[in-house]
Design a protein with these regions (language model features):
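ATP-binding pocket architecture of kinase catalytic cores
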Residues: 25-147
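Short beta-strand segments
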Residues: 43-47, 71-72, 134, 196-199, ...
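An alpha-helical support segment within catalytic cores of ATP-dependent transferases
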Residues: 2-17, 75, 108, 113, ...
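Active-site acidic catalytic loop and adjacent metal/ATP-binding pocket
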Residues: 33-36, 44, 178-229
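ATP/Mg2+ or Mg2+-diphosphate-binding catalytic cores
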Residues: 246, 279-321
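Alpha-helical scaffolds flanking conserved acidic
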Residues: 268-275
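Active-site activation/catalytic loop segments of kinase-like enzymes and analogous catalytic loops
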Residues: 229-263, 276-294
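Conserved N-terminal boundary motif of the eukaryotic protein kinase catalytic domain
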Residues: 18-25
Length: 321
C-alpha cells in the first residue's frame, strides 16, 4: 500500500458505526493483506482498491453457518488516497494446524464429519459456468465442459513453464507431466455442473473453538468448479503436512467415511492426481527455481501413484462413484 492504514484511521472507521474499541490488533492475512482484529469480535479488511469482488464472495455464502458475515462496507477518505474496507464478524477459535497438538483423535474425526456436512451445504450453491484454475482462475466463466477447460488450462500452464528457466531434468519431468495429463483427461468427462467452491480449502482455513469446528475463513479464492476439486488441498496437506509431527489422516479418513457428495465421483483418485499435478506446475510457474527442488519430486510422486497410496492408507476406494 502507498501508506498503510494506521490505528487512528481504524478508530475513525469504528467511530462511524459507534463501535467502541477495547481491544485492537493488526495482523497480516493471505496475500500480505493488512487485517485488524477488533474487540475479539470483529475483523476489518482494508485495500487501496475497491473490494467489490471480495465482498461479493462473502455475500454469496452469507446464508451459510460457520462463515464470516459482512457488517459494514465503505470508503475512508484521506490525503494519501482512499481506503476501501470491509467489516466482518470474527469467528471464534484458532486454525486446525495451530491447535492440532491440543486435539484428540476423537476431535479430529469429529472435525472430519463436520467438514463433510459443511462441504455438502456449500456445494448446494450452483453457478452457470466454470472457473478453471487454482487460487485465481486462469479461465474465468469458462463456457465449455470441465474437461475442455482443463485442456485449455494445461496449455496455459505449458506456455508459462516454457518461459521458466528450469533444469534439464525438471524439463523432462514437466514433459512427462503434460503427457500424463493428456493421457488421463478422460476421467474429467464426468461433471455435475459448476458448484461453489472455497477453493483454498486446507486446515489453516478451518477453525476450532474448544475442540469443535467453529468456521471456515479466507474466502478470497472462492470460485465455481466441480465439487471434487475442493478436495485438492486436503489431499496435498495430508501427504505433505506443514510439520512432520502433524498427521491429518484421522481427520481425512473420517471426512471420507461421512461420504460427502464431493467424494462420490467416478475415478476420484485419478481426478485428484490430475489436480495435484496442476497444483505443482502452477506453483513452480509462480515461484520459479526456488520451488523447483521441492515440487518437481512431488510431481513425480503424484504421477507414480501418490493419491492411490494415500487412499489405500485411509482405506478409501479411489474409484469413487
Amino acid at each position: 500500500m502507498k501508506k498503510e492504514i494506521d490505528l487512528t484511521e481504524v478508530r475513525r472507521i469504528c467511530a462511524e458505526y459507534q463501535i467502541e474499541i477495547k481491544d485492537l490488533k493488526s495482523i497480516t492475512g493471505s496475500f500480505g493483506k493488512q487485517i485488524f482484529l477488533i474487540n475479539q469480535a470483529l475483523l476489518l479488511r482494508v485495500s487501496e482498491t475497491p473490494m467489490t469482488l471480495e465482498q461479493d464472495k462473502f455475500r454469496r455464502v452469507a446464508t451459510l453457518d460457520f462463515v464470516p458475515k459482512i457488517i459494514h462496507t465503505g470508503v475512508l477518505q484521506r490525503e494519501a488516497g482512499p481506503i476501501y474496507y470491509t467489516l466482518l464478524t470474527l469467528l471464534p477459535g484458532d486454525d486446525f494446524i495451530s491447535v492440532y497438538r491440543e486435539t484428540t483423535e476423537a476431535q479430529q474425526r469429529q472435525l472430519g464429519r463436520d467438514i463433510a456436512v459443511f462441504l455438502d451445504t456449500l456445494h448446494e450453491f450452483s453457478g452457470t459456468a466454470y472457473d478453471i484454475g487454482l487460487y485465481v482462475p486462469a479461465l474465468a466463466h469458462f463456457s465449455g465442459t470441465w474437461r475442455e477447460g482443463h485442456h485449455e488450462y494445461w496449455e496455459l500452464l505449458r506456455q508459462e513453464s516454457e518461459k521458466a528457466h528450469l533444469r534439464s531434468e525438471s524439463i523432462q519431468v514437466f514433459e512427462r507431466a503434460y503427457r500424463f495429463l493428456q493421457a488421463s483427461s478422460a476421467v474429467l468427462e464426468y461433471q455435475t455442473g459448476p458448484k461453489l467452491l472455497h477453493n483454498d480449502f486446507h486446515p489453516r482455513n478451518m477453525l476450532l473453538h474448544q475442540g469443535r469446528f467453529s468456521g471456515v475463513i479466507d474466502w478470497e479464492c472462492s470460485q465455481y468448479g466441480e465439487a471434487d476439486f475442493e478436495l485438492c488441498h486436503l489431499i496435498h496437506w495430508c501427504l505433505y503436512p506443514p510439520k512432520p509431527d502433524i498427521d491429518l489422516r484421522e481427520f481425512l479418513r473420517a471426512l471420507f467415511e461421512a461420504s460427502p457428495t464431493c467424494a462420490q465421483v467416478p475415478d476420484l483418485a485419478q481426478r485428484l492426481t490430475l489436480y495435484q499435478i496442476e497444483h505443482e506446475i502452477q506453483q513452480i510457474n509462480w515461484q520459479g527455481s526456488e520451488a523447483e527442488s521441492l515440487r518437481v519430486p512431488r510431481l513425480v510422486r503424484w504421477m507414480d501413484g501418490g493419491v492411490d497410496e494415500l487412499f489405500a492408507n485411509l482405506d478409501v476406494d479411489g474409484r469413487g462413484g
